[in-house]
């Protein structure tokens, strides 16, 4: 069996099994490598003008055989792609005879085998991951929609901090929806057309996916910034600029994503814009994300330092310290929960740690929206109190239309005063 026939059979096997590696089908890696190798082989053949050699350079569909003199033989290793299936990749030998190149020996299926049982195992593994992240995103969308409805419907919960919560909820909904849109646009079936598609829908889905990811990180950062400003406020007039956070939280991701789209259109308008992990344009997206994760972690440490000072017995009564802790505990949980593993992975190559990265980012990451809704809404004491009042039939007209702000004053020697909402 020659290289072209074996390559075609491998593609059929990969497409049949639907194996996925990372965010791409495994057959896309195979097709990409074959195209690159074929192009390099043809370019090398064009630069060789020596017609005295017995066998000219040729591409057999899988390997590039260099020009060789009559009576000589060449041995080449199997393509690098086969290392996905094990470390024991063999060599293929061909002789240059008077009549031309001999058949490969040993045959490609023997020298470069593809174990079907391994493909079946990988199919089962990634199918399970897909079921998990589809379920996780679906649960997250439902929980986040309910949480937004609660915070919007209960007027006593209207305050800047809860407004920021709703923005964060919206970014998780956008992120989950972008995953479904991208899957529908790129992986529509078992064919390999998605490996080379260049449709507008495909590119738009990738752009929306990047925008959703960036807005998600920006509003997680906004939560930390707002809490830091709130805890460090030294005057009733030093309120955080909420609308500046709104502008930055949505505007900067739109600006970065728009710049990335312009870069792709100008310099790399090929295929679906999804194969760009080594592209300079990719840092327009990845750079701000890495920066936001680093800043968020710094704010996390700063918030801890502020709380340690404010929770000292000399800095206020038991009620005041309880208010500070209740205000901060959700954000203190979320920042390390959603940031530490990104700090680790952002400084590793994109191909490193796939066995950990895939289930962590696609599987567990799909439940982040649900966790946010639980911490910021369903377990929030004020939210539960308001729902109880509505549920047990208290007349909402007898209650204030809006929650009043509470002024917390520390002992005179500290000369610190904090003006904030309890929610």
Swiss-Prot record:
The record's listing under SUPFAM superfamilies reads: Family A G protein-coupled receptor-like, Hormone receptor domain
The intrachain disulfides are 41-64, 55-96, 78-112
Q: Is Signal tagged as a keyword?
A: yes
Spell out the Gene3D superfamilies in the cross-references: GPCR, family 2, extracellular hormone receptor domain, Rhodopsin 7-helix transmembrane proteins
- Entries under CDD domains matching the protein: 7tmB1_GHRHR
This chain is glycosylated at 49-50
Keywords recorded for this protein, A-Z: Cell membrane, Disease variant, Disulfide bond, G-protein coupled receptor, Glycoprotein, Membrane, Receptor, Signal, Transducer, Transmembrane, Transmembrane helix
List the GO molecular function terms: growth factor binding; growth hormone-releasing hormone receptor activity; peptide hormone binding
Main location (coarse class) = membrane
Tissue-level expression: Pituitary gland.
Sequence ranges on the Extracellular membrane side: 23-130, 189-210, 262-283, 353-357
- Spell out the subcellular localization from the entry: Cell membrane
Indicate how the chain sits in the lipid bilayer: Multi-pass membrane protein
Does this UniProt record's set of keywords contain Magnesium? no
A Gene Ontology biological process noted in the UniProt record is: regulation of protein metabolic process
Intervals, Cytoplasmic compartment = 152-167, 232-240, 305-331, 379-423
Which residues does UniProt assign to the signal peptide? 1-22
One cellular component term from this protein's GO annotations in UniProt: membrane
Q: Which family does it belong to?
A: Belongs to the G-protein coupled receptor 2 family.
Disease association reads: Little (lit) mice exhibits anterior pituitary hypoplasia.
Purpose: Receptor for GRF, coupled to G proteins which activate adenylyl cyclase. Stimulates somatotroph cell growth, growth hormone gene transcription and growth hormone secretion.
What is the name of this protein? Growth hormone-releasing hormone receptor
């Amino acid at each position: 069996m020659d290289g072209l026939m074996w390559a075609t059979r491998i593609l059929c096997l990969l497409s049949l099994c639907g194996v996925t590696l990372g965010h791409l089908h495994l057959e896309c890696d195979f097709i990409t490598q074959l195209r690159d190798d074929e192009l390099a082989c043809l370019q090398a053949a064009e630069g060789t003008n020596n017609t005295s050699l017995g066998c000219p350079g040729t591409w057999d569909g899988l390997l590039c055989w260099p020009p060789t003199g009559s009576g000589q033989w060449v041995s080449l290793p199997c393509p690098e792609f086969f290392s996905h299936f094990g470390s024991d990749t063999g060599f293929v030998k061909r002789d240059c005879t008077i009549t031309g190149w001999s058949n490969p020996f040993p045959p490609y299926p023997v020298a470069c085998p593809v174990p079907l049982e391994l493909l079946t195992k990988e199919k089962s593994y990634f199918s399970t991951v897909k079921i998990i992240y589809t379920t996780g995103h679906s649960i997250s969308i439902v929980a986040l929609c309910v949480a937004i409805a609660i915070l919007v419907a209960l007027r006593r919960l209207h305050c800047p901090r809860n407004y920021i919560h709703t923005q964060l909820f919206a970014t998780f909904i956008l992120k989950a929806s972008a995953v479904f849109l991208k899957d529908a646009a790129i992986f529509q079936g078992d064919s390999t057309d998605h490996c080379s598609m260049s449709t507008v829908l495909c590119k738009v889905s990738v752009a929306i996916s990047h925008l959703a990811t960036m807005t998600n990180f920006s509003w997680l950062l906004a939560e930390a910034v707002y809490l830091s400003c709130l805890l460090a406020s030294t005057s009733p007039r030093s309120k955080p600029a909420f609308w500046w956070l709104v502008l930055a939280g949505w505007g900067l991701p739109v600006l970065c994503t728009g710049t990335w789209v312009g870069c792709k259109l100008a310099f790399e308008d090929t295929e679906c814009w999804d194969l760009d992990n080594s592209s300079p344009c990719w840092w327009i997206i990845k750079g701000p994300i890495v920066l936001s994760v680093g800043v968020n972690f710094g704010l996390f440490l700063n918030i801890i330092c502020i709380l340690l000072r404010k929770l000292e017995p000399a800095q206020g009564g038991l009620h005041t310290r309880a208010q500070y802790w209740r205000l901060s505990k959700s954000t203190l949980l979320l920042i390390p929960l959603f940031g530490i593993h990104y700090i680790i992975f952002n400084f590793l190559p994109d191909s490193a740690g796939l066995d950990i990265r895939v289930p962590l980012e696609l599987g567990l990451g799909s439940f982040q929206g649900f966790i946010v809704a639980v911490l910021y809404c369903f377990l929030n004491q004020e939210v539960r109190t308001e729902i109880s009042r509505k549920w047990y039939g208290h007349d909402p007209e007898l209650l204030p239309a809006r929650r009043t702000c509470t002024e917390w004053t520390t002992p005179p020697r500290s000369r610190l005063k904090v003006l904030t909402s309890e929610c």
